[in-house]
From Swiss-Prot:
It is found in: Cytoplasm. SUPFAM superfamilies: EF-Tu/eEF-1alpha/eIF2-gamma C-terminal domain (SSF50465), P-loop containing nucleoside triphosphate hydrolases (SSF52540), Translation proteins (SSF50447). The keyword GTP-binding applies. Its EC number is 3.6.5.3. Signal peptide: none annotated. This is Elongation factor Tu. GO terms for biological process: adhesion of symbiont to host cell. Residues 136-139 are annotated as: G4. Residues 174-176 are annotated as: G5. It catalyses: GTP + H2O = GDP + phosphate + H(+). Belongs to the TRAFAC class translation factor GTPase superfamily. Classic translation factor GTPase family. EF-Tu/EF-1A subfamily. Residues 19-26 are annotated as: G1. Residues 10-204 form the tr-type G domain. The gene is tuf.
Length: 394
């Protein structure tokens, strides 16, 4: 049979399984692919295929991640599953696998465990918009009241981290029994995917978001003016648009007088395009790498923020020794390094290679930033950590 062609007609949504080790994340992933393949076409994937996750590199960090895909009646899902807890931490902090929503897997037999909490916290810190819950291994619990108790605990945990516990869909089932073909449990997988369809919002397309282009280079072309180059991160820019240059120095306004790509003049550029943009009235020295060109008022420069950070282990090429408060590395945002000072949370004296930690960072120059922006931590050009802006302070 010929390969089915990739259907572009359905909206594409990125999800992932999160939760404590051995609560059944990978088994659930296998169950969803099997049930959806039977109902809507596509490939069923076995536990072993998913579990032997290939290594990937994201921002110089090695992460083991498995990618599967499946179709619901309304959507095409790309789904990530990680074998180890450390892989989740790295994956979520680096944004290697962007998640529009997460499926929290919690064993009904064990209830919430430390990593259940930690993955919910990470989801909050890195800006995962919605979580749906699958209470797994319900076939091992005879007591209705016990199931209700675990459900209540999970909802309370979600509330603690500012997810709407009461409104979150909670599906009770057994991934293993669904794989074995037990009809009652297959139905629960269908219910779960239906809950994802209903509860996880389809992501806004990159082209619909406000325009932003991280500036990589600046040239001056005699007789034409100043050109900034870079890859449009999101949004669309048209010739004639007013834009701002934000970051490092005071914000400046200008107008786009030309957009070129591969030496051809265009009327517009959009997310993903590598372009040169001609800007009116700015000199070559007014603009520098590390600033962004953006829709006026859409993004502000900031210097102080709270971040969730993963520190590379020695084996990953990171530091060999811990760092302490007052640590001053470079923070690499988009296209440039900015020096900053680190404050650690109360009671944390030092951070070891391989740890993840919440910290407050103060940069010496402002950078255009939103919550959710990813960055690398570097020492002399070598990556020693990865982070994400969790909360802007000033």
């Amino acid at each position: 049979m010929a390969k089915e062609k990739f259907e572009r007609s359905k909206p594409h949504v990125n999800v992932g399984t999160i939760g404590h080790v051995d609560h059944g994340k990978t088994t659930l992933t296998a169950a969803i692919t099997k049930v959806m393949a039977e109902k809507n076409g596509g490939m069923a994937r076995k536990f072993d295929e998913i579990d032997s996750a290939p290594e990937e590199k994201a921002r110089g960090i090695t992460i083991n991640t498995s990618h599967v895909e499946y179709e619901s009646p309304n959507r095409h899902y790309a789904h990530v599953d990680c074998p180890g807890h450390a892989d989740y931490v790295k994956n979520m902090i680096t944004g290697a696998a962007q998640m529009d929503g997460a499926i929290l897997v919690c064993s009904a037999a064990d209830g919430p465990m430390p990593q259940t909490r930690e993955h919910i916290l990470l989801s909050r810190q890195v800006g995962v918009p919605k979580i749906v819950v699958f209470l797994n291994k319900c076939d091992m619990v005879d007591d209705e009241e016990l199931l209700e108790l675990v459900e209540m605990e999970v909802r309370e945990l979600l509330d603690q981290y500012e997810f709407p516990g009461d409104d979150t869909p909670v599906i009770m089932g057994s991934a293993l029994r669904a794989i074995e073909g037990d009809e009652a449990y297959v139905e629960k997988i269908v219910e779960l995917v239906q809950a994802m369809d209903d509860y996880i919002p389809a992501p806004e397309r990159d082209t619909e978001k406000p325009f932003i282009l991280p500036i990589e280079d600046v040239f001056s072309i005699s007789g034409r003016g100043t050109v900034v180059t870079g890859r449009i991160e999101r949004g669309v820019v048209n010739v004639g648009d007013e834009v701002e240059v934000v970051g490092i120095r005071p914000t400046q306004k200008t107008t786009v007088t030309g957009v070129e790509m591969f030496r051809k003049l265009l009327d517009r550029g959009e997310a993903g395009d590598n372009v040169g943009i001609l800007v009116r009235g700015l000199k070559r020295d007014d603009v520098e790498r590390g600033q962004v060109l953006c829709k006026p008022g859409s993004i502000k420069p900031h210097t102080k923020f709270e971040a969730e950070v993963y520190v590379l282990s020695k084996e990953e090429g990171g530091r060999h020794t811990p760092f302490f408060k007052g640590y001053r590395p470079q923070f690499y945002f988009r296209t440039t390094d900015i020096t900053g000072a680190v404050e650690l949370p109360e009671g944390v004296e030092m951070v070891m290679p391989g740890d993840n930690v919440k910290m407050t960072i103060t940069l010496i120059n402002p950078i255009a930033m939103d919550e959710g922006l990813r960055f690398a931590i570097r020492e002399g050009g070598r990556t020693v950590g990865a982070g994400v802006v969790a909360k802007i302070i000033e």
